[in-house]
Amino acid sequence: MDPQQIKAALGSGLLSFPVTPFDAENRFAAAPYQKHVEWLSGFDAPVLFAAGGTGEFFSLTPDEIPAIVRAAKESAGKTAIVSGCGYGTEIARGIARSVEAAGGDGILLLPHYLIDAPQEGLYAHVRAVCQATGMGVMVYNRDNAVLQADTLARLCDDCPNLVGFKDGTGDIGLVRQITAKMGDRLTYLGGMPTAELFAEAYLGASFTTYSSAVFNFVPALANKFYAALRAGDRATCESILNSFFYPFMELRSRRKGYAVAAVKAGVRLVGFDAGPVRAPLSDLTGEEEKILEALIDAHRE
């Protein structure tokens, strides 16, 4: 896809990011990954994010990422595949090139590694990555990589292939400033952990979609919530929030890293061989998996 095509795809429906399965030797397990991606692509997600945050990008080596992208492309049918990308500038540029060579449709630029940086440094980083690829690029505003509206506007002027903005800050004032300033120059995605909890607020700030983690294991329920959100059906949204998302949030909040580990547990519980999370994350306890299993069983469709 060219940058404008991936921009349109990103804004055309509910998105998700498959977990990355590992085998007993802690290696990427391509076969179960492809089985899961093929299943997810049947639930009308226009884009799936391979090797994203929930796909444990932070635990992958740069060499593993193009293999994951190739596996996703082979099994996703018509669903576009956007890859995670990040770390320091030169590593990120290399990942962008390798993803493009592997057939990826775009990249999601996650925060750089560890240090804080001034706006000029963030500008230089994003610009350098955009210049390394012909694919569409989406920036992920969160943690130590928060672009301000003026910086983002400069990047949009200088980088034609910068087509998307994903927010993980929860700063509605900033994101509304960005959407007011940039208008339809970008596609906007909500990116808070368990994005459904914030979806109504982000919709009011002109974010029409988001990436759903729970789509990994309850895609029909995720689609039902998204359809209700877009239809203005507040009663259905509140019903699903109360019956599923708030209990899931309580479980997810028990330990740091469970925003990923709980999703991977959910994927295992619905029958896919996702394997464990990689260190430094920890898997749910047996008791916690039983709680999650009961929650899933109550919402099977």
From Swiss-Prot:
Signal sequence bounds: none
Source domain of life is Bacteria
Q: Which NCBIfam families does the record associate with it?
A: KdgD, PRK03620.1
User: What is its EC class?
Assistant: lyase
User: Pfam families, alphabetically?
Assistant: DHDPS
Protein name per UniProt: Probable 5-dehydro-4-deoxyglucarate dehydratase
Say yes or no: keyword Isomerase present.
no
Q: Which organism is it from?
A: Cereibacter sphaeroides (strain KD131 / KCTC 12085) (Rhodobacter sphaeroides)
